[in-house]
Amino acid sequence: GGGAANKNDDFTFKVTITGIDGTYSTNVAGKTITNGTETEFTLRHGETFVVKNLPENASYTVVETDKKGYQKTEVSVNKEANQTSDTAEGTIRMDGENTVDYTNTKTVPSPTGIALEILPFAVLFLAAIAGGVVFFRRKRG
């Protein structure tokens, strides 16, 4: 319904990741990700959903499915320019950020005109360190 932004609103999202084997953990207890399976989660104001140790070139789709009456949703993938959309898609990279930032905006009547209320959310994909092993070669003196 109407009214001002509520920082306790739970907004519902779904994430699907492909190009992965096995099960991947998240920062939510009991919530795991498997290849091609849609996983639902909720976020409140300022919260972040994290998927851990994803391999390079895994593909993801994130969709906000319940906006709680907010009129506008913007999404930014890897800190690039905002797009007005409920859906974000991308590929895991080793050489940079793997983030999806959502911003929901609600226009509320105000005695002084129009007030915009904005709630930010983030989805963070943590790439696995390539191979997870670093080799150091000792120079022979």
Question: Which residue stretches match the model-derived regions?
Answer:
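Solvent-exposed loop/turn and edge beta-strand elements of beta-rich ligand-binding domains
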Residues: G1-G141
